[in-house]
């Protein structure tokens, strides 16, 4: 997967748009990219898909498809919108266990895994324990540790390990596969 022309939640957008990102991909021999169509809280998944098609149309230099990002799994999203998009070919979606604008709680994750199982979709999970990161970050800030090297210290291996193992446990509960993305530590494997 890749991230193209994607808002980040702090009013900035990823540096590569569909033209520059797909040009780079083509130069490297890649013929298809799958960036994310990210739902905004309070918005619909269909709005996200429509927005990303507008961003790509006339700019993408190679083929593209979209993974979805689900941030607001309302009953309507779970019962109608997500199943309809899966039926139309959007068969993978990503969820987050971290980042305030994106993270879901375990119950929401279970609800989405149930849809994935029923509709035969793939769930990708960015697994980090948001509360541990927030707690560690607060301690760093209290001590004035703000240099880039302290970023890693607010995301110790145990933080990723716990969330990864929890995500796997939730998938086992529903007997549905998940793809853990952005694994950085041996303990999470």
Question: What is the meaning of each model-derived region?
Answer:
Residues 2-59:
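Metal-associated gating/positioning segment near the N- to mid-region
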């Amino acid at each position: 997967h890749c991230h193209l022309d994607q808002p980040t939640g702090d009013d900035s957008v990823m540096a590569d748009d569909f033209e520059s990102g797909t040009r780079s991909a083509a130069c490297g021999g890649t013929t298809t990219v799958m960036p994310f169509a990210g739902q905004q809280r309070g918005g619909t998944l269909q709005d996200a898909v429509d927005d990303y098609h507008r961003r790509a149309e006339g700019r993408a230099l190679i083929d593209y498809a979209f993974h979805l990002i689900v941030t607001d799994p309302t009953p309507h999203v779970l019962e109608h919108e997500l199943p309809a998009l899966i039926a139309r070919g959007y068969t993978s979606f990503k969820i987050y266990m971290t980042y305030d604008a994106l993270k879901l709680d375990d119950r929401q994750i279970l609800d989405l895994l149930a849809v994935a199982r029923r509709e035969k979709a793939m769930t990708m999970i960015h697994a980090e324990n948001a509360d541990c990161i927030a707690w560690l970050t607060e301690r760093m800030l209290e001590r004035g540790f703000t240099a880039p090297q302290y970023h890693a210290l607010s995301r110790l291996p145990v933080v990723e390990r716990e969330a990864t193992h929890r995500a796997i446990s939730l998938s086992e509960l529903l007997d549905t596969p998940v793809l853990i993305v952005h694994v950085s530590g041996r303990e999470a494997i």
